[in-house]
From Swiss-Prot:
It comes from Adenia volkensii. Expressed in roots (at protein level). Expressed in seeds (at protein level). Its EC number is 3.2.2.22. GO terms for biological process: defense response; negative regulation of translation. Disulfide bonds join C245-C269, C285-C304, C328-C343, C414-C427, C453-C471. Glycans are attached at N358, N398. This is Volkensin. A carbohydrate binds at D287, V288, K289, V290, E291, Q300, K305, N311, N358, N398. PROSITE patterns: RICIN_B_LECTIN, SHIGA_RICIN. It comes from the Eukaryota. Keywords: Allergen, Disulfide bond, Glycoprotein, Glycosidase, Hydrolase, Lectin, Plant defense, Protein synthesis inhibitor, Toxin. The active site is at Y74, Y113, E162, R165. AMP binds at G111, G112, Y113. SUPFAM superfamilies: Ribosome inactivating proteins (RIP), Ricin B-like lectins.
Amino acid sequence: VFPKVPFDVPKATVESYTRFIRVLRDELAGGVSPQGIRRLRNPAEIQPSQGFILIQLTGYVGSVTLIMDVRNAYLLGYLSHNVLYHFNDVSASSIASVFPDAQRRQLPFGGGYPSMRNYAPERDQIDHGIVELAYAVDRLYYSQNNNQIALGLVICAGMVAEASRFRYIEGLVRQSIVGPGDYRTFRPDALMYSIVTQWQTLSERIQGSFNGAFQPVQLGYASDPFYWDNVAQAITRLSLMLFVCSQPPRQSDSPLVIRSFVDRNDPVCPSGETTAFIVGRDGRCVDVKVEEFFDGNKVQMWPCKSSQNANQLWTLKRDGTIRCQGKCLTVRSPQLYAMIWDCTTFYAPATKWEVWDNGTIINPASGRVLTAPTGEAGVTLNLQFNEYAASQAWRVTNVTVPTVTTIVGYDDLCLETNGNGVWLANCVKGKAQQRWTLYADGTIRSQSTLSKCLACSGSCVKLAKIVNTDCAGSANSRWYFDNYGGIVNLRTGMVMDVKESNPSLNEIIAHPWHGNSNQQWFL
């Protein structure tokens, strides 16, 4: 009755593991949220015959079947030798329809990691990898020792259940697969550990986000924390969210942001108004000039300061206004500069804005978008026709420092540059030419040359070559990371593609989306 997803662990390749996780993810997903991230099905709509997924894993000496709850993608137990072993926080009646003829055995621990600590090592002390997963399956197949069972389940949870929920974890596993029969190990790092722990909180806050921003979620270890407070930070690493609620998608949502259908008629998420920085071109912040709040004062781009500087903190109100110290962001006419003014005395339509999920801020009355006409500090903002240019991209956030990361692509090779060219090469930890800085304006810049941006050579049309060139705030250098692993040019919808799936050509091109592995990227 229940869907079955098989995986032969000892024969794993990057392709077979990716296919396995994709099939599992597709079985779990109930649609795409308005934020562009897939989520699990609405529990209220799940029929009894749809409540579980059976994951059939083959190890070196035997096979077991993991039982997954489709409501939360958690493991409930496993079947081995016609005995169904289940966690002690899972009632036998709740899984009565799963293998009804099998014997039942309740394990002495629950499904959460805190409950397993008395039986298995701490997570950051447990090696993960394909060989370790195969041995984990064998432990579940033959062992009656609770410590061995707990260790096996921890590894299965990390490399199967959690990898289905997080592209970041899937990427860690992929990178551990060197080739057929050639596997490395890894241990959970701070990001893996914390996103798993904070998954429910992330799901709630993302689905309750307003204009892409949400209340910050602390990640990392307590001794070295970092924060996510914007959908753009999560969309590349989070594959599935718990179903919490939704808000109806606005007519202004970009079709390039959401590839699949968007759920509708779901409970509406409560979301509050957001006060944060608005970060844009070249990583600078929207700023009321010289911290003076008189009517008509100009709004400019300026290096981001601290949260103590009121002239860079903006409140995005539910009435469509964007306010700094109570004054509204506005323009006298589309041809003139952006400024602040008393919200109650200015022409109301000129004070109304829509903040699109793709980072565009549009004034509906004029049909034009907020633009930083140059990259210089102190440049006054204005309105221009929407070109989906990097000069027209914004992020509402309290994290003003750009993200620095590697970008891993086809064959688990790293994106690299050393001048104007862009290609894939073997990943080398710490290599500056493989470290990329992701700016709020949608540009992708090599850490070794921050004045250059990845861009299409000419327009981003099919087969256009991707090059590393001087940043100009143009549409051909504005990119969007989607939830499926694509790096999308917002203007044309083309994605970065390893030409002919052949890294030896040393060429990345723009191409229509087809979803094959040469268009899949991991951060």
